[in-house]
From Swiss-Prot:
InterPro entries: F-box-assoc_dom_typ1, F-box-assoc_interact_dom, F-box-like_dom_sf, F-box_dom, Gal_Oxase/kelch_b-propeller, SCF_F-box_component. This is F-box protein At1g59680. Transmembrane segments: none annotated. It holds the Pfam family F-box. Residues 2-49 form the F-box domain. CDD domains: F-box_AtFBW1-like.
Length: 364
């Protein structure tokens, strides 16, 4: 009699590739050999690429939800994170999700593919203005978290910064002496985090620039130029975990939407090239008050899938049941998709990985 353990590797791979990412842990428990196999090989990655789907995570009803996007619409894959506290922010790096909990004391690092969870307790209670980012040391792949704490006074300067080290399981203060303000829009790439930043010096212009936190050197790099002169209305994303992408568009002052991607990117240097420029005047139904948020690009089809932030900050569950994603491409291609109104105005693009770390129990 044939058992689950007798199935060929190819057939097991086909079965596992059809399982939603957040359900893999439950499926692994059904067969020891399946569990071993899936912890040494990523299934489903080729299928995502073949179907031109984008996998991402967001927060809905204070739960982490996985979503799949393609040019036909959006699908909610379900949620396997229900019993691990209420979450209000999620950040992706290296196949790991850094989840910030609503109790303002605990962080959770989660590998959805492997099902590993690590609870981390903050050194002191944090507020909604505190920003957390995840990265790693490029010399030894040791993962770290940086926390930048803000107190919104007349200067709006960061008050302190701390780093959590996975190897030592401890926090320590770091000196950064900032004269800039970091926007919440940030992206992880090759172990480092790239932020939009703005000078706070009285005689400085307020134009945005790019700023990288290097997790290997544990310091911020120099100001990196953006490809457009922008004071707002710019959003970051990444392409295949290899390049940064930038979306610029303000239809109150401009008639086009621009997507730029990096030719070169490291903590100390960047160069850009235009990927897509769309004239939005002919697009019937394009909103006048469009406020671009998280986005994904399809390099082959030259389209962008972008989340409209307009009204999110002023919405409640009573007056906002749905928000919209817009799919925009060359030659006037334009359509929209409704999505349930989320707690977080951002999506974290996700790429599965086999990164492992020492799991911990619930952090009290």
């Amino acid at each position: 009699m044939t058992t689950m353990s007798d199935l060929s590797v190819d057939l097991v791979g086909e079965i596992l590739s059809r399982v939603p990412l957040t359900s893999l842990s439950a499926v692994r428990c059904t067969c020891k050999s399946w569990n071993t196999l899936s912890k040494h090989q990523i299934f489903g990655k080729a299928e995502l690429a073949a179907t031109k789907q984008f996998l991402g995570f967001t927060v809905m009803d204070y739960k982490v939800c996985s979503l799949r996007f393609d040019l036909q619409g959006i699908r909610n894959d379900g949620d396997d994170f229900v019993d691990h506290g209420e979450v209000y922010d999620v950040f992706h790096s290296d196949g790991l999700l850094l989840c910030v909990t609503k109790d303002h004391w605990r962080l959770v690092v989660w590998n959805p593919y492997l099902g590993q969870i690590r609870w981390i307790r903050a050194r002191k209670q944090f507020g909604y203005s505190n920003m957390f980012s995840l990265g790693y040391n490029n010399s030894n792949r040791n993962h770290k978290i940086i926390e930048v704490s803000y107190v919104y006074d007349k200067t709006a300067c960061p008050q302190y910064s701390e780093i959590y080290d996975f190897n030592s399981s401890s926090w320590r203060l770091v000196e950064i002496n900032p004269v800039w303000f970091l926007h919440s829009d940030r992206v992880s790439l090759k172990g480092n985090t790239y932020f939009f930043a703005q000078d706070l010096l009285k005689d400085a212009k307020i134009e945005n620039y790019l700023l990288c936190f290097d997790f290997t050197a544990e310091r911020f790099g120099p100001h990196l130029p953006l490809p457009v002169h922008s004071y707002d209305d710019v959003t970051l994303s990444c392409v295949r975990q290899e390049q940064l992408a930038l979306l610029y568009g303000n239809n109150e002052t401009d008639d086009s939407l621009e997507i730029w991607i990096t030719n070169q990117i490291d903590p100390n240097a960047v160069s850009w090239s235009i990927f897509l420029k769309v004239d939005i005047k002919p697009l019937i139904g394009f909103p006048k008050d469009f406020d671009p948020g998280s986005f994904f690009i399809d390099e082959e089809k030259k389209v962008v899938v972008v989340y409209d932030l307009d009204g999110h900050l002023y919405s409640t569950k009573k007056n906002c049941a749905y928000q919209r994603l817009y799919i925009i491409g060359e030659d006037g291609y334009f359509t929209s998709v409704k999505i349930k109104c989320s707690d977080s105005p951002e999506f974290s693009a996700y790429a599965p990985s086999l990164v492992t770390y020492k799991p911990t129990n619930y952090a009290k």
